[in-house]
UniProtKB/Swiss-Prot annotation:
EC number assigned by the record: 7.3.2.2
Main location: membrane
PROSITE patterns per UniProt: ABC_TRANSPORTER_1, ABC_TRANSPORTER_2, PHNC
Record protein name field: Phosphonates import ATP-binding protein PhnC
Entries under PANTHER family matching the protein: AMINO ACID IMPORT ATP-BINDING PROTEIN, PHOSPHONATES IMPORT ATP-BINDING PROTEIN PHNC
Gene Ontology annotations for the cellular component aspect, listed alphabetically: plasma membrane
Function field: Part of the ABC transporter complex PhnCDE involved in phosphonates import. Responsible for energy coupling to the transport system.
Cellular location(s): Cell membrane
Amino acid sequence: MIEFRNVSKVYPNGTKGLNNINLKIQKGEFVIMVGLSGAGKSTLLKSVNRLHEITEGEIMIECESITAAKGKDLRRMRRDIGMIFQSFNLVKRSTVLKNVLAGRVGYHSTLRTTLGLFPKEDVELAFQALKRVNILEKAYARADELSGGQQQRVSIARALAQEAKIILADEPVASLDPLTTKQVLDDLKKINEDFGITTIVNLHSIALARQYATRIIGLHAGEIVFDGLVEAATDEKFAEIYGDVAQKSELLEVAAK
């Protein structure tokens, strides 16, 4: 379980990114967070593995505080958290296989991983992960030779090879076309269902949130304004999440597509 206890985040310029967040996400859930740009979705997501440090409160993972973790303990906890970024976050000039093997870095010494000395068991894990997302034939291609959708599937394979217990996906389909968007979200959903990996995804699309989520969390101005099952996420609730009544009809048109 991931638990946020009275979590707040204030940026150096005084902007409040998160305001007293209290939230529990159970093991194996597939949660989608929605809201306007700047609502706090990315800040909340990235605070889980401390890419963003919180100002107040505490974040617990399986009853252990990642907020208080240091050194080896922090590295161990981060090893269980796979991150998928909008920009893919791949080493473009490296092969797909090497990018997937980056998911194994947390299991070995810095010297060993710098030299690329991964054991054959790790290489086999990487191949299995690539096969899982239907991109095994690209193992020895350079990452920058791949389409955007293929690169994002490499990111998913990296998280699988990492043997992550939690996957955090920050706007993973923002730059992808509709067909590729479906492929990437289908992959994430299937992995969640087959392996029980707790998955949190940030999205802008109301329609996609309704299609894929089992639970939707809506953020507005750094606060949770909705938290419930898909069935409870009515058009009116989405209008509240997005906060502008004048845009309500536009939002509902998007949701209907």
